[in-house]
Design a protein with these regions (language model features):
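Solvent-exposed, non-transmembrane regions of membrane-associated and secreted proteins
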Residues: 16-269
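N-terminal Sec-pathway targeting helices
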Residues: 1-14
């Protein structure tokens, strides 16, 4: 009897291991195909023009955000300004594409999707709508696809192969935060630079998820108060807009990591 039970347990373990191996192989093949898809998109839809004037230092831009003096209508530049993408051509390829997100030297370089009537449509779909475990970064359905007066919440998966929003985990390390403060978002036909405010480990009940439309001054003030409550920041000055990047923490479940940034201004052409 004991021998029979042992054989059954061994058989079950073999099946489980084989199944896990098959899943892992499928996962990484799928991930590789997705990576190739987004690399191709980045190459095909990149624009040739780049800022020609010597960029202003990142520290001076950060100080303008901290002082609440930066005007989004006044273009700014950054030392590592990434190339722009042809958003009109991307939208012609897929009307759900409203922007492009880039964080230099992190691997985050993806189109941004927006489907207000079905907010999580791209949770497990690639740019072309095909089934994909990594999905495509997407904008919260409550947001407007514009930079000003919005807390733009972008969602992306924490993938085992290091793709999508996995690099956001690195922001939990102080040294990484200090050297990756610039976040670039192309949206509404323009390219914007956001300056990093803070990163936090939280969950899906975090109060920052409640804020998307900041057009009302009271709501905007309440949002900044919520940032102070959720982080260790001592103060957050008013900015024209904000960006919140959200991904699952390594612990899974309802745990999340949020990277919060303030709009520094439009990048000049």
């Amino acid at each position: 009897m004991k021998k029979t039970v042992l054989v059954l347990i061994t058989f079950a373990l073999v099946i489980a291991v084989a199944g896990s191996g098959f899943w892992l192989v499928h996962y990484f093949i799928d991930s590789r195909e997705q990576r190739q898809t987004y690399e191709t998109l980045a190459e095909e839809f990149v624009l040739e023009s780049t800022p020609s004037v010597r960029p202003e230092s990142s520290s001076s831009l950060d100080s303008s955000v901290d002082a609440g003096e930066n005007d989004v209508s006044s273009p700014v530049e950054s030392p590592d300004t990434p190339p722009r993408h042809d958003l009109a051509a991307l939208a012609a390829e897929n009307p759900d594409c409203v922007g492009w997100l880039t964080i230099p030297d992190t691997g985050i370089d993806y189109p941004v999707m927006h489907t207000p009537d079905d907010p999580e449509h791209y949770l497990r779909r690639d740019f072309y709508g095909n089934s994909a475990s990594g999905g495509t970064p997407f904008l919260d359905g409550r947001n407007l696809a514009e930079a000003e007066n919005q807390n733009l919440i972008l969602y992306g998966h924490n993938m085992m192969d290091g793709s999508m929003f996995k690099p956001l985990m690195n922001y939990l390390e102080p040294n990484f935060r200090d050297t990756h403060k610039d976040i670039f978002l192309e949206i509404d036909g323009r390219q914007y630079r956001y300056a990093l405010l803070d990163v936090l480990e939280t969950n899906t009940q975090c109060s920052l998820y409640q804020y998307t439309d900041l057009n009302d001054p009271v709501t905007e003030s309440n949002f900044r108060a919520a940032i102070l409550k959720e982080t260790d920041l001592e103060g957050v000055h008013q900015a024209p807009g904000y960006l919140t990047l959200s991904t699952c923490n390594n612990g899974g479940g309802s745990s999340r990591v949020l990277v919060i940034a303030a709009l520094a201004g439009e990048v000049s052409q």
